[in-house]
Amino acid sequence: MYRVLRLLPLPLSVAISLSALADEKPPNWGLCPATLPLQGFEQAPGMDKHVVQSRPQLPTNIEGDTLTGTARTPLYQGNVLMARGDQFLGADSVRMDTETDSYVAEGHVRYQDSSILVVADRAEGNQDTDVHKISNIQYQLIGRRGNGVAKSVDIHGQVGQTHEATYTTCDPSQAIWRLRAPEIDVDNVEGFGVARHAVFEVGQWPVLYLPWFKFPIDSRRQTGLLYPQLGYSGRNGFDYAQPIYLNLAPNYDATLYPRYMQKRGFMIDTEFRYLYDDGKWQTRAAFIPNDQLRDKDRGRFSFNGYHNIDNHWQARASLAWVSDTRYMEDFSSRLVGMSSLSSLQSTVGVYGTGETWTAGLMADRWQLTDYSLDESALAYNRQPRLFFNWDKPVFDFLEFGLYSEVVRFKHDDAYLVALQNDGNYLRTGEVIRYYGGTRLDVKPYLLLPFTGASWYVTPTFGWRYSSYYLDSGIAEQLNGNRTPVRSLPIISLDSGVYLDRDTSVFGRNYLNTLEPRFYYLYVPYRNQSDLPLFDTRAFTFSWGQLFRDSRYTGPDRQNDANQLTLAVTSRWLDQNTGKEDLALSVGQILYFKDSLVTLNDSEERIQQGKSVWVSDVAYNVNDRWTLNATYQWNPNFRRDDLASIRARYLIGSDGIINLAYRYRRNTLDGTTQLKQTDFSFLYPINPRWSAIGRYYYSLLDKKPLEIISGLQWDSCCLAVRTVLRRYMRDRTGNMDNSIQLEFVFKGLSSVGQDTDRVLRRAILGYYRDDLYLVPPSNTTTDPDAYDPNKIP
């Protein structure tokens, strides 16, 4: 029998509220039972947001084995089923009162919609007043595995109250943890819930008592405490932070991070975010009064934001400041040796982009953040920099372009430091004065791309004009000329051929390619000894260097050249899968004359003859084994200048082993510059236990750079990670130790230090998806990051 009426909404408060506490990143439920504790209606459809939003407009169908009673109080009995959209309600019997719009559902009451399953003994209420009461319920969230029980739920419109409720994502037969509360109030209008006298239990043991606990129940943000962060390190001792979130308005908020470090004292860290229609910005500031280890006040500040002026123009700023040169060492856990630890850059600018052009006006400043260095290690400040780039294809075979910029360079004076007998670095009192200047660099070019089905020839004709207006101090250090000028043509011819054939190796069919490439470059000599070095250095020789029109990063030097690059790449592509199993590349530059331009007196001239051989190999042995190698051989000195070998083995669905060897020679004096081994792994011992580790060792210094060891235990609803780490904390070789412990309560939150950040950096492939990220291209849409030496 069928009858159309409104269906009880049953917004189960406890389940809706506690599910909002889940992690943003989907947890791994692979160790959970294949079936959920509660099973739904076979007729129930999948999640459909459009159906959910249109529920009030949909009719309700009701059916049962028998219909008795009166017109006012019909009684449905036997396999009663009510359905509306994605909502289903089943019971042994449902009695209705059509005048008061009340109902009573009894016997095996079941409810299901797109997000939840509910089993109860009894449900009663009034659909007109929207007041309902559900007794002795068990619930199961769909998709999140959250489940629990409640003695009763009282619903008054959009406000609900649960009694004697629990929540866990564990299987009910093995509930490792659960959240229990005698009373939870939920306000769907305001978007928050309040739990009173809540207890968090692990096993049968209560581990956390919350007399009053307010939490969000939807995506709306709520002011309150976030989960604490715990850790221990040799530098700070016991480390505890308690984040406090402040939802100040719909478009701006703040987070406070009160932090206690056993060896340093108290620290306050703050973050403020502001969002509006045309942009957003974020500030972060930290302050530690009287750091007990340094005996002084310390702090930092950062600002990042942008504002969209119109469809073509955007203003951007990224500012950073720290109180002293030891701040980064003391409060950063990254390995040293990176420029980001020795200096901080602040930039502000206005940038524009169009279909054929980019332009901008910006300024930046560098701050020294390494106590063992002086200001001479800093880059020049650009205050300001104005640039304009234009590229316009005219025909299929003709393209015009222009790179141009004008920059005013400034530099802080360098106050020299020296290492003392006690191991500290102190100022010596000596000062090196730095001077700046203004540089104009213009680089127009004409490009003629000719292509065929299996070949291409691209001649390029460019011209570089650079002029300077130098401060008198820097001009005197050179040749005394304050307005030097350099002007010269740059001519190149890039060509290549694509050949392929069908072949078979060990019974597998391959498409084998042969891709020779020829790149000729001619640049006449210009004496550049009277030009300063503001932002120019030599590129590290690599495969990409074979095809650049300059071996320097900036316009202060443009090398002369009469050279030809010969290179070839061969690939083996599996014809069944399309995968590239093997790729071999080798190349070399032939110098037809000496290159007289050098960066400075310490750089040797390029002699007529041959460059080092550059080779790259990428071999995918199978779906689990990959090998990569890079090698550079110097035929002039009969020595290897660079070698890099990397092997990776994938274990199961998430395990990995990485092994790498890196070697680099200082090409100026022939000494070994770098010699390292790197071994890291995530090894699954069994489905629950896995070992993690890294041993990063310098063969040159005969000491480790980083050692990581740890264990992970995983289950359906709980994961525990413990990580022991020893790492180099500064460029002088001082080491530090840390202990990180993290408990991940799946579907709820994590407690302890965030181990993911450290492990993802140390173990490539710790997150398997990281292996398949597309590496950044050499090209960029950032108008402040263009390479003035690169012609497309």
Swiss-Prot record:
Q: Where in the cell is it found?
A: Cell outer membrane
Task: Please give the coiled-coil regions recorded for this protein.
Answer: none
GO process annotations (BP)? Gram-negative-bacterium-type cell outer membrane assembly; lipopolysaccharide transport
GO CC annotations on file? cell outer membrane; transporter complex
Keyword tags? Cell outer membrane, Membrane, Signal
Pfam families assigned: LptD (PF04453)
Q: Which InterPro entries match?
A: LipoPS_assembly_LptD, LptD, LptD_C
Renumbered to this chain, the signal peptide range is 1-22
What is this protein's function per UniProt? Together with LptE, is involved in the assembly of lipopolysaccharide (LPS) at the surface of the outer membrane.
**Family statement:** Belongs to the LptD family.
Q: What does the subunit section of this Swiss-Prot or TrEMBL entry state?
A: Component of the lipopolysaccharide transport and assembly complex. Interacts with LptE and LptA.
Can you say what this protein is called? LPS-assembly protein LptD
Taxonomic source organism: Xylella fastidiosa (strain 9a5c)
